[in-house]
């Protein structure tokens, strides 16, 4: 029985980890090796996964700082940084707020901006941002990666990459986007090209570099580009 349980655990582990697998080539040939990504790894690719019930804001902010700005920060580092500017008791019961994020970002010498916009304008947003959604009665911070047509692509620290119909997203969103602005922004960061759902056939439009003028609309200044 112990051997059976161990085998099952190993099987589960293999399904959640990347592996290099060999595939038969032409008849009589050798194997062709290809790196295979597990479903879980694909789901959280380029996202910082939250580890606690209250840390969705920290994980979302860590995702943007790491993937869009190259800052070597994980969720725990961001939690510690934000706790220095927040009330620990409020955080324990309610989680972090956008104000906590703003204070932390500004302590790093960066800027934070909150914008209230209509759902129909989301496609004009050219940078990844943090938004607050209400999902099944719970308020939850996620990374708004991109809006294309009638779909919104979200990096959820708890659930991974998600795609919502724009109308569905708008029902659970409070209408505010929280943008992090500063030097070192990578215009080709992976958050702008989220993976399509595994069942989808259509791919995102080919990535187009973001122009300076588009970034400056959201608070970037010329010195941020050098």
Curated annotation (Swiss-Prot):
Highest taxon listed in the record's lineage: Bacteria
Protein name in the entry: Probable functional amyloid protease FapD
Domain Peptidase C39 intervals: 50-180
Phenotype upon loss of function: Deletion of the entire fapA-fapF six-gene locus shows no visible growth phenotype.
Major location (coarse): periplasm
Active site: 56
GO molecular function annotation: ATP binding; cysteine-type peptidase activity
Disulphide-bridged cysteine pairs: none
EC assignment: 3.4.22.-
């Amino acid at each position: 029985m112990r051997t059976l349980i161990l085998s099952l655990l190993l099987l589960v582990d293999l399904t959640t980890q990347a592996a290099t697998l060999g595939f038969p080539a032409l008849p009589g040939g050798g194997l062709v090796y290809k790196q295979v990504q597990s479903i879980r790894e694909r789901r959280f690719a380029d996202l910082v996964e939250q580890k606690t019930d209250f840390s969705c804001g920290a994980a979302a902010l860590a995702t943007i700082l790491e993937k869009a700005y190259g800052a070597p920060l994980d969720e725990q580092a961001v939690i510690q940084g934000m706790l220095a500017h927040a009330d620990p008791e409020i955080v324990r019961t309610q989680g972090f707020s956008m104000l906590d994020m703003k204070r932390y970002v500004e302590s790093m010498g960066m800027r934070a901006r909150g914008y209230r916009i209509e759902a129909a304008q989301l496609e004009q947003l050219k940078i990844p941002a943090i938004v607050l959604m209400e999902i099944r009665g719970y308020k939850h911070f996620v990374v708004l990666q991109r809006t294309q047509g009638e779909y919104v692509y979200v990096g959820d620290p708890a659930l991974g990459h998600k795609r919502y119909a724009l109308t569905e997203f708008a029902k659970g969103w409070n209408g505010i986007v929280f943008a992090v602005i500063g030097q070192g922004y990578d215009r080709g960061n992976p958050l702008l090209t989220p993976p399509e759902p595994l069942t989808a056939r259509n791919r995102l439009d080919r990535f187009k570099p973001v122009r300076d003028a588009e970034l400056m609309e959201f608070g970037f200044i010329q010195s941020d580009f050098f």
